[in-house]
Amino acid sequence: MKMNAASIKNQKAEWEALGVKLPAFDHDAMTAKTKEHPVWVHFGAGNIFRGFIAALQQRLLNEGLQDRGIIAADTFDYDIIDKIYTPFDNLTMMVTLNPDGSTSREIIGSVAEGLRADSSDAAMMARFKEIFTDPGLQMISFTITEKGYALYRPDGSLMPVVQADIDEGPAHARHAMSMVAALLFERFQAGAAPLAVVSMDNCSHNGEKLQSSVMTVAKAWAEKGYVGQDFIAYLEDESKIAFPWSMIDKIT
């Protein structure tokens, strides 16, 4: 029995006989509604996201407190999308080790779509633009590690990929932070709807790091004439674009 959208719908008894907990919501309806009117995109589709963040969204869906899921994206390891998400209809088997040594298993179905944030893939980038220009999008979040926000080399110079992104403008963004800045520019041009831009990485002042990197790229584009100062003002207006800080644990 393969884990996919059809099996969790049509083979519920078989899954439950194996002791696997299934989504308590209409997975097909959630997927369709999320794709049509997305509210949340998460960058960094690895295990922390699947085992914690997606699991929390599943709890809200199970309780009827949400009707849409998450669109997962990866900016670095595209195999995660191609080999782990797509073949299994974006479902994840979460296995929890309990205090008594037993395990519990649950299929996490809160991810509606998996995307490769690959600037060389025209179809993927068209889908990202479609999502980011939807005024109903509420939040984009990140678990890309602290290194994912870095723009500079140890000698203080910009990484070559970042420098190329700055020189070539929003249409050719490749680095994760450049891509986010470019997609926010698309949102600005489509009506300047508000958005929460939320780092969920375990590093001190995570929101500040994310904001600094996005603003560095955006301001460099403004200096080169790729974007106007009105876009910079949009990014700096906290009533429009918010970069909150989040606490993952008490280490930082």
What does each model-found stretch correspond to?
Residues M1-W245, K250:
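Conserved small-residue
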